[in-house]
Amino acid sequence: MQENLDKRLEALRTEISLAARSLFDLDKKQKELQVLEEESSEENFWQDSVHAGKISEQIVSLRRQIQEYQELKSKIDAIEFFLEDADALEDPAICEDLEKEFLFCEKKLAVWETQRLLSGEADKNSCFLTINAGAGGTESCDWVEMLFRMYSRWATKHQWALEVVDRLDGEVVGIKHVTVKFSGMYAYGYAKAERGVHRLVRISPFDSNGKRHTSFASVDVFPEIDDQIKIEIRPNDLRIDTFRSSGAGGQHVNVTESAVRITHLPSGVVVSCQNERSQIQNRESCMKMLQAKLYQQVLQERLEKQSLDRKDKKEIAWGSQIRNYVFQPYTLVKDVRTGHETGNVQAMLDGELLDEFIKAYLAEFGEVS
């Protein structure tokens, strides 16, 4: 047992040393934090409140990441301390605690290893995720709500802030369409793996004959863009429509036309927002989403060009079916791109296993930094 634990400790020591230099890049993060903290201490820092808010978010994120590294290193030091005490290893309770610490450290290092595959220019950004009901009527609307719950729980697990930007409920149950914003580091890098069509097979609870139904929902993901990225949008290229909100919003719902829909005529991209209380706020949110969607198109064009330049790379078809969720006659979730699968459908829909599917996708299609 001692020999096995010593080997695991040595592996952790090696991996955290590598993480400090490359995976985590501790020196770079500390320098970035120092620069941002110096900027935030300037006298006129809050004159541009939007920019100041973004800088403050970056500072909080960097501090949290550096703290995570320091805590992990402390845990490894503590493990080493206990391993030097042979008598302590005779205590089952201490051995159980050591195993928990080992698993925690190994899991955290695995997360950093995954983030090494997130080297795209927008991978660190927050993102918008949209789910639309496909063929299947009421069943598909229920499927959208199930996916929305899965992604919400998954985002909470990653400690990302969640904001529903736009939502249209189904006529009977569920959701026809929903757009949610995930705010946090690497939100886009992880969520982009979910872009595509998701297929559900189950015995419908809405069918009195108990027949098996197949439903579809499409997921789209696009990154929030920062101030450094400029997307030119000409006012003449926009058609702006207003309508009454059909969702939450207090006394203003269905009273004033506060909801906004913007169509970008050259590209055909359509965005809408009804979450805010005023038309002005909804319009601002729409413009942010439109910029993000147009930026996503730029990224996709670059990716397609890279695929042509690299014949050895597997094709990534964004609009295709990516995953099957089967409840009957057996239970199985299978990603058709990677072959990764699980028989625990409920844990998947609880957001507990989604990272495993995303990691498999990144291992096959991600770019190593």
UniProtKB/Swiss-Prot annotation:
Function: Peptide chain release factor 2 directs the termination of translation in response to the peptide chain termination codons UGA and UAA.
Residues making up the signal peptide according to the UniProt record: none
GO biological process terms, semicolon-separated: viral translational frameshifting
UniProt organism field: Chlamydia pneumoniae (Chlamydophila pneumoniae)
Gene, per the UniProt record: prfB
CC per GO annotation: cytoplasm
Entry comment on modification after translation: Methylated by PrmC. Methylation increases the termination efficiency of RF2.
Tagged with keyword Nucleotide-binding: no
Cellular location(s): Cytoplasm
Protein name: Peptide chain release factor 2
Major localisation: cytoplasm
Gene3D superfamilies, sorted: 3.30.160.20, 3.30.70.1660, Release factor
Pfam family, one: RF-1
Keyword Protein biosynthesis appears in the UniProt entry: yes
